[in-house]
């Protein structure tokens, strides 16, 4: 998908389940921005503590995945090429610490200080 065609939450979840390798981070953030209000919040990801306002992309994606009861691999696919090209292709690198920690600790390592997303009502 590209940003030229706006996706719905259901479009994104369908793409995620049918063609996870085609999901792009920018599209995920666009869907989140379109359908949710975001409130910066701190969160733990394994031993890493992210302060409110830091690593907001990871915060949004992880909270969206939690709201939609996604599996660990579905959640990782939401990070798009950051996961596929940067993390999977370079397993010993140290970039994308939140993605790498989620690979290692999964949902057991995630704890939000408060709700980060609230679905918009029309």
Task: For every predicted segment, state its role.
Residues 31-35, 78-82, 102:
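Short acidic/histidine-centered micro-motifs embedded in hydrophobic/aromatic stretches
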Residues 2-5, 10-15, 116-120:
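Long, charge-rich, low-complexity intrinsically disordered regions
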Residues 6, 10, 31-32, 58-61, ...:
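Intrinsically disordered, charged low-complexity linkers and terminal tails
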Residues 18-40, 114:
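Short, charge-rich, low-complexity alpha-helical interaction segments
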Residues 47-97:
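Amphipathic protein-protein interaction modules
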Residues 1, 42-50:
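A ubiquitous short alpha-helical element
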Residues 4-7, 23, 27, 94:
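Alpha-helix boundary/N-cap detector
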Residues 94-122:
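Long, compositionally biased
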């Amino acid at each position: 998908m590209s940003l030229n065609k706006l996706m719905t939450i259901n479009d994104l979840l369908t793409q995620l389940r049918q063609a996870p390798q085609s999901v792009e981070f920018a599209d995920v953030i666009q869907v989140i921005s379109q359908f949710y209000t975001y409130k910066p919040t701190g969160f733990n990801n394994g031993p890493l503590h992210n302060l409110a306002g830091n690593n907001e992309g990871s915060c949004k994606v992880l909270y969206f995945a939690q709201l939609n009861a996604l599996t660990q691999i579905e959640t990782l696919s939401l990070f798009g090429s950051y996961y596929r090209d940067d993390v999977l292709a370079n397993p010993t690198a140290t970039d994308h610490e939140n993605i790498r920690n989620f690979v290692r600790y999964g949902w057991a390592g995630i704890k939000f200080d408060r709700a980060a997303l609230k679905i918009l009502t029309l």
